Amino acid sequence: MSESSDISAMQPVNPKPFLKGLVNHRVGVKLKFNSTEYRGTLVSTDNYFNLQLNEAEEFVAGVSHGTLGEIFIRCNNVLYIRELPN
């Protein structure tokens, strides 16, 4: 299957129920810049889609740069959010 057909097979997801379902789950949050991703447990989200993570770890270009603990990510910096396996 080609990449374009993979993309066309994706179904749109309503973001509010999607994020609500990820609370208390491990997630990866990719930022729009610097190839930065934060991985941690989603504690909460608000109506603007700002995110609070606990036990967060920072990755730049796939390399861990340490554990940060509890962090807040402003919504306009987020490229995508994905659920991580436990």
UniProtKB/Swiss-Prot annotation:
Q: What is its main location?
A: nucleus
Any one GO CC term of this protein is: nucleus
Gene Ontology BP term (one):
mRNA splicing, via spliceosome
| Alphabetized UniProt keyword annotations | Cytoplasm, mRNA processing, mRNA splicing, Nucleus, Ribonucleoprotein, RNA-binding, Spliceosome
Q: Which terms in the Gene Ontology molecular function aspect does this entry carry?
A: poly(U) RNA binding; RNA binding; splicing factor binding
Where does it localize? Nucleus; Cytoplasm
> Start and end of every Sm domain?
14-86
Domain of life of the organism in this record?
A: Eukaryota
Matching entries from Pfam families are given as: LSM
Q: What else does UniProt say about it?
A: Present with 2570 molecules/cell in log phase SD medium.
Self-association or partners: how does it assemble? Component of the Sm core complex, present in spliceosomal snRNP U1, U2, U4/U6 and U5. The core complex contains SMB1, SMD1, SMD2, SMD3, SME1, SMX3 and SMX2 (Sm proteins B, D1, D2, D3, E, F and G, respectively), and is probably a heptameric ring structure. SMX3 specifically interacts with SME1.
Which family does the entry's similarity section mention? Belongs to the snRNP Sm proteins family. SmF/LSm6 subfamily.
Function per UniProt? Plays a role in pre-mRNA splicing as a core component of the spliceosomal U1, U2, U4 and U5 small nuclear ribonucleoproteins (snRNPs), the building blocks of the spliceosome.
User: Which protein are we looking at?
Assistant: Small nuclear ribonucleoprotein F
Quote the gene name from the UniProt entry.
SMX3
